[in-house]
Amino acid sequence: MYKKDEPAVTREMLDKGLALLSERERAPKRIGEKSYADTLMELMRLVLLKNETISLTAITEPEEFVTLHLLDSLACVGLPELGSAKEIVDVGSGPGFPGLPLAALYPEKRFLLTDSLRKRLEFAAFAATSLGLDNVDTLHIRAEKAGRDPSLRERFDLSLCRAVGKLPVITEYCLPLVRVGGAVYFYKTRMADGELVESRLARELLGGSADVRIIDYVDLLPGRKHALYIVKKDRTTPDTYPRKEGIPSKVPL
């Protein structure tokens, strides 16, 4: 449970992580501002308070929340694809991660948060409103259906996907939503290196790049082997993908 007088160490952990991120090339100036850290702390308070009545997250200790939700969400700060993106879709956002921390940092970019679980997404919408984030929209929809929707298909400059599934599956969820020339950031652990080989066919069929850039961020999350797997989109996704709801997870490419 979140306590209003949470130990100062929680804020210190957050400030230390934000200071590391602020040193990155192309990191926005706002990341070093007190008001941004205040926004993240308020987001944590909102999540943990609501988590007492609705299951939003299994991470309930504030120190772990700072590390595994807030700082982990911000691992992509300073990367060129994020810097140039204007429209971003967060696939399987749940209660708003990584979308909300990034939307608060980049108010000039538009974020669409999608999820198949209505209650979590309703909370994300509530949190966005509470935090004054007018650059966030939410949509209750399965990823497969979103990828076949003409208003969403190949619309976004960047797709984010965190803690949703294995690479062969989530590649089919995300690549159809991204325009040619765009990219997908998959938040994974280095244990996913085996999944990378398994997802080669999916990338080939869906228009993704053969080469995948992997960025470790152990400096941001000491002791955690987390990484971003970055896939560029080189070609248009064939009309046959994504397949119908439930098929990608049952029969991965």
Where are the regions that the model predicts?
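Residue-level signal for inorganic ion chemistry
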Residues: 47, 102, 124, 188, ...
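Helix-to-beta-strand junctions that scaffold the AdoMet/dcAdoMet cofactor pocket
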Residues: 106, 178-180
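Conserved SAM/SAH cofactor-binding pocket of Class I
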Residues: 63, 74-165, 171
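SAM/dcSAM-binding transferase cores
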Residues: 200-253
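Short "lid" loop at the C-terminus of a central beta-strand within the Rossmann-like core
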Residues: 144, 189-194
